Amino acid sequence: MSRFFAGGSDSDSDSSSDSEPVIRQQVAQFTFSDEEEDVKRVVRSKKEKRYEDLSNIIKSIRNHKKIKDMSSVLTSFEEFMRAYTKALPVVMKEENGVTPRIVVRALAELEDFVNESWDDKESRKNLSKNNNKALGTLRQKFRKYIKDFESDMKRFRAAPEDFAEEEEDDEREDEKGSDEEEEKVVVQVEPKAVSFKKEPEKAKPVKPVADSDSSDWGSDSDSDSTSSDEDAKYTSIRDRFLKKPEKGTEEIASAPSGVSGDDAFKKEKKKKTGEALSKKKKPKQDEMFDENEEEEEGWKVVNGTRSGASEQPKMFAKDAEIDTKLVVNKLNEVMAARGKKRTDRKMQIEFLRELRTVAETNNLGPAVAVKIRFNIVSAIFDYNPKVSGAMKLEHWSKLLEEIQELLKLLLAHEDVHLSESILDEYEEYDTAPFKIRGCMLTAVERLDDEFTKLLKECDPHSNEYVDRLKDEVPVTNIIEQVVTYVERLGNEMEICRIYLRKIDHLYYKFDPDVLKKRKGQLPANTITSVEEMDKLCRYIYAKDQTDRLRTRAILSHIFHHALHDNWFQARDLVLMSHLQETIHHSDPATQILYNRMMANLGLCAFRHGNIKDAHLCLVDLMMTGKPKELLAQGLVPQRQHERSLEQEKIEKQRQMPFHMHINLELLECVYLVSAMLLEIPYMAAHEFDARRRMISKTFYQQLRSSERQSLVGPPESMREHVVAAAKAMRHGDWNACANFIVNKKMNVKVWDLFYEANRVREMMIKFIKEESLRTYLFTYSNVFASISVPHLADMFKLPKSKVHSLISKMIINEELMASLDDPTETIVMHRSEPSRLQALSMQLADKVTNLVDANERIFEMKQGNFFQRGGNQGYNRDRQNYRNQNQNQNWNNNRRQDNRNRGNRGNQNRGEGREQREHHRDHHRDQREHREHQNREFREQREQMRNVEYQNKAE
């Protein structure tokens, strides 16, 4: 056998290979096999590797987003940051530092996902603890990481279509490249199976071979060729599986000969992708217009339902005769599903609207129209299952429209009676008077509550709150119409309820016409809000049978009077109603209204110059340190266990809307200024009195905390201004005190919030002068022998008559020990009060006396316990001896005699100890009586000295 055949080829027969040993040629290590050599190897660049890593991570992020796996999204995002850091040199080199569009698009999608997940509080509650934690971490890291891509993100938000086109091109190129590779592999492998001919250099389509040897192999190629012929009919795989051609595919089919089908398909897909991305940016209210545009383009809109039906079921059969009974039965059938678990609330509203259209078309009368519209209102109320949450704005606008139309029907047809006292069996729809079961007042009360919820949900500092506040005009108009309707019915209880709703929208609003009418600037027949409130409240006082409505009406009436400076009317209402005694038994909403009334009453008293009354009104609110919570204007942060989640949720529901808030800084400033005007003269008058009481604990704490500071700078906050003014007043410097209270900063913060700010500022300066004068006299009365009244008037810029009246009042009240000399216009001091050294000596003597008494009581307690303990011990010994004697009665006489002698000796010792104790007690009693006698003599001498001084003063 020749050496040629000894080498062994792949085409040798089995017999030849078995008969001769095959001599294999040694192959170098790390060489590729024949099969691997046949496959074309691709060498990827660094750019392709980095971009492929990024695309894989982006795909994993999208997959994790679909299932809301926040932990995996966070992990993938961290991998993305590391991968992009590695790819950054390639981006700087290949893209000239421009961020790849696929990266920008992925970041934008992730930003939308993170924001939506964070804003959706309900879904966040359903997340696990790890996912919640991962979402917070992801949000922080993403917001920090996204700062470097702000410009790219803005460009993407402005034109997302450009980014979508490039991504589609990349995907199409990848698909095209993969298809070409598959074709190349088939071309290279298939001829090897078909024949042993030499392969051509260029890849060509495989044709079936007619040889008999290859007939078995050729069947596969035939099937492939036939399938490829069938596939050739379609431009793409997408067209193959389409149920019917669309507009886009028709355009592709009718493309000009110069443009290939693939290119036309690319353009069409890019166009639709850009439209889809742009639609994502549109608001929800434009979806209806988008659907209309899609219908024009050839899309078929399918409205899915729970039952899977594509069309809305018909209300009645085609040949059915529509009458009142049929419509009412259908209405009852629709409303029977109200409140059930699987009821589609949106579809229920649509059913009712369709039923309303049918009733209007067949002209079934006003009663049926009122019944259907009232049920539509109820269905809209039921659409929001959350009691505490506010309804959507689209439902709110529809609710306003439906109630307005319903009221028009009720006011236009006086023979239609809508009342909840009418039973379903006695409803009348055909003949007048029409009777329908329902309560318009309840619907309006629910509407008012929903309006309040909407205001609470909005940010008070945004334009949205202003827009929602504009809805108060239609709400108040609806209440006015219901007032007219209820007054026509004549039910007193319902009239009181709707009057109270009208009061709730009126009591906190300031009417400048009231003050103008008081000054004579308006005609006398002008009806102001005060007169309107007086009429409404008086009716409730007379007709209401429940305490709650009457109490709320009184509180609102007082609030409105105080708001318009009717101080005496407001004060008399408070005193006559005795609300302060029974308010603790009221519900929380009424207690909040009471707190608001007291705050506004305090402001009114301050504007009228009644400083003491203002302080008394505000002290209960400010002493607690929680005026914000007491007025329902927000929650103060508390410790973890002081307030549970349920309590916090309930308190948030009780909060007042922002436009009804009372300025807390204004309240605190008025309270502190009132406390300063009362506390500083009192402190000066009772400087050496150890038992003096504090008028205002809060003001006293502010003053003491300021005195403890080693370095005190110029005042900045409102509290610091008041404390600085108080320090100036203690020295009698009224000018500095007034400058601290009335200045540009304080005017902006506080005083300009009053209606007549200039009058309030003048009133405060007048009181500061008067109280500074009183403080000056209390502080320096022991220094002067006499003081000139004109000098005091000039010093404090007060008229002489005012200074004279102030000093006379102080002398009459025995606050100042002095006398007025009218001819010389001087104040003569009587020197009745002790000097500073004498006062300190008397304080020291009192404290030493109290200390001695306390020590004596402690000593007596200790000595008494000691002696009592010894006596008990002797008594116990007696009992023991007596018990021993009883036990030893049967013993011999000697032992009994010894025990008796021992007992006698013990009794003798106990008697001596008792005599000594009595002697000690008598001695201590004598000493205590002697000291008490000395103290009594000292007190009598001091009282005699004071009586002599008083007599001298009187003379």
UniProtKB/Swiss-Prot annotation:
Keywords, in A-Z order: Cytoplasm, Initiation factor, Protein biosynthesis
Region of interest (Disordered), residue spans: 1-22, 157-299, 865-955
Skewed-composition ranges (Low complexity): 206-218, 882-894
Main subcellular location of this protein, as a coarse class: cytoplasm
Compositionally biased spans, kind Acidic residues: 162-183, 219-229, 288-297
GO biological process, one term: translational initiation
Biased composition (Basic and acidic residues): 230-250, 911-955
Entry GO CC: eukaryotic 43S preinitiation complex; eukaryotic 48S preinitiation complex; eukaryotic translation initiation factor 3 complex
Compartments, as annotated in UniProt: Cytoplasm
SMART domains the record matches: PINT (SM00088)
Listed GO MF terms: RNA binding; translation initiation factor activity; translation initiation factor binding
Pfam families recorded: eIF-3c_N, PCI
Residue ranges annotated for the PCI domain, each copy included: 658-834
Entry annotated with the keyword Lyase: no
Domain of life: Eukaryota
Keyword Protein biosynthesis in record: yes
Subunit structure, interactors included: Component of the eukaryotic translation initiation factor 3 (eIF-3) complex.
Record function comment: Component of the eukaryotic translation initiation factor 3 (eIF-3) complex, which is involved in protein synthesis of a specialized repertoire of mRNAs and, together with other initiation factors, stimulates binding of mRNA and methionyl-tRNAi to the 40S ribosome. The eIF-3 complex specifically targets and initiates translation of a subset of mRNAs involved in cell proliferation.
Family the UniProt entry places it in: Belongs to the eIF-3 subunit C family.
PANTHER family the UniProt entry points to: EUKARYOTIC TRANSLATION INITATION FACTOR 3, SUBUNIT 8 EIF3S8 -RELATED, EUKARYOTIC TRANSLATION INITIATION FACTOR 3 SUBUNIT C-RELATED
UniProt name for this protein: Eukaryotic translation initiation factor 3 subunit C
Source organism of this protein record: Anopheles gambiae
Gene: eIF3-S8
